[in-house]
Each structure stands twice: as C-alpha cells, then as structure tokens.
Amino acid sequence: MDCFCKSVRQDILRISRHSGHGHIPTCFSVVEMLAAVYSEMKHNPADPSWDERDIFILSKGHAALAHYCTLAHSGYFPVKDVYNFGAFSSIFGCHADRHRVPGVELSTGSLGHGSCVAAGIALALKIKKSPRKVYVLIGDGESNEGTVWESLMVAAHQKLDNLTVLLDHNKSQIRCLPITRPADKFRAFDCETVEVEGHNVNALRAALSAPANGKPKVIVADTVKGWGCRTLAENMFAWHRRSPSKEEMEMLLGELK
C-alpha cells in the first residue's frame, strides 16, 4: 500500500504540473483514505456499474484529482488519460462528473451534499435488504454545512449501519471556524465513531471493517494537509490551488515518502 500511495502522489504532482490545475495539499491528505476504501469495498474496474458494487462518494470534490489517480491505479482507466485533467475537452474536470468518469458515483463540488446523497442511497439499500455498503469522504471544513449533520440525524434514526462516513480532519479549517473535538460531536449524533491516524492504511482498513453495532459509522481520520512532502505540509496555505513549476515538481517528487 505504501507503493500505491506514493505512486498516486507522484501522479498528482505530475498531472498538476502538466495541467496547471489541482488542489495538491488537500489531495495529499486523502490518499491513504482512498487507498483503504478501495482495498476494502466491493468494486469492479472492468464493470463500474456492477449491480453488486459498494458505493463510494467523494463529497469534498476539490480533491477530485486524488480520486482520479486512485481510480486509475485501481484499473478503471490508464493514468495517462488523466493528464488531460482540467482541459476544456477532458472528461476529467476539476470537479468530477458521474456521467463521464468511470467509477465516479456523484458529481460533487458544492460542499455538504455528499453525505445527504450517501444517506439516501444507504436507506434505499437497507429497504431492499441489500448487503451493499456506502462510503462517503467529507472534509472538516465541509462539516460547517448543516446538511452534514441533518444527514447524520437521518442516518442514525434509520440505523444505517451500511453507511460509513470518513472525515478528513486535516484541520486547515482552523483559520475560520474550527470543528473542535469532532468525534464527540459525531458520538452525540449516535454514530459509531472511530478515531484513527489518517495516513496509516492498516489502521484505516481496520476501522472500515470494524462492527458498526447497528449505527452509521464515522471514521475521524487525523490527517495533515500536504502529507508526504515536507514543503507542502509546512506551507500548505501557500500551495492552495497552486501548481508547481518544473523545478518545484522535481523538488517535491524528491521529498515524497
């Protein structure tokens, strides 16, 4: 898994340099979570619409490049295709389009919607008595949206133990209105809540496979924006929505863990 995550980060850097687009630090903070989810969930790259697949939704849509690279390394399409990221004619937009990109279940970008759709899908699957599961990855800044908490109220009331919410707790939201002690808040909403080190794939996989005890599960992943590159992690705000020069890309590639 370490090699998988390093390869994903390398491609994020190279594609951002090539395209001039991408939120590199926030993409880096979710790499291990994406790797863990795609190693645990049921999915079929040869048949992205497979009826028995589990559902994954990336609600923090500005990390789309990390999702594309994860899908590519999971076999959904060649990595070289993603080098058109952000181009006018490309299917790989700066925010994902479910009608165009294999493996993308929801078009996202406006924050706070992913958890609502995920709860609705989980409820529908529960009514159908389907064994399929639903996963949604949200950001801590996104958690300022009331819709996140409304969807969790519904999920807890309906006992949606087939729903797992992963929180990218990279704490960059501390500049504005910080979400303090998020695990306590999720427990107060009657969610089965687990706190893990968000860059430890084995810990994430253990949390994903742990019993939900009849409740929606929330995994609070303690992450670092820009994780994997010292320069990005120490200067995350300076790199917000910024692509590297050729020299900077080579430096960052050399720093990758």
Question: Where on the chain are the PLM-derived regions?
Answer:
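Conserved thiamine diphosphate
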Residues: 130, 178-207
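Cofactor-binding active-site loop characterized by glycine-rich and histidine/acidic residues
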Residues: 12-15, 27-157
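Generic beta-sheet signal
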Residues: 54-56, 132-136, 163, 213-223
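N-terminal capping segment at the start of a domain
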Residues: 5-21, 167-169
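Short, small-residue-enriched loops and turns at beta-alpha junctions
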Residues: 171-176, 227
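A short alpha/beta connector and helix-capping loop motif
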Residues: 145-170, 218-221
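Short catalytic-loop micro-motif centered on adjacent basic/acidic residues
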Residues: 24, 136-138, 193-197
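Glycine/aspartate-rich loop-and-adjacent alpha/beta segment that forms the canonical ThDP
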Residues: 201, 205-257
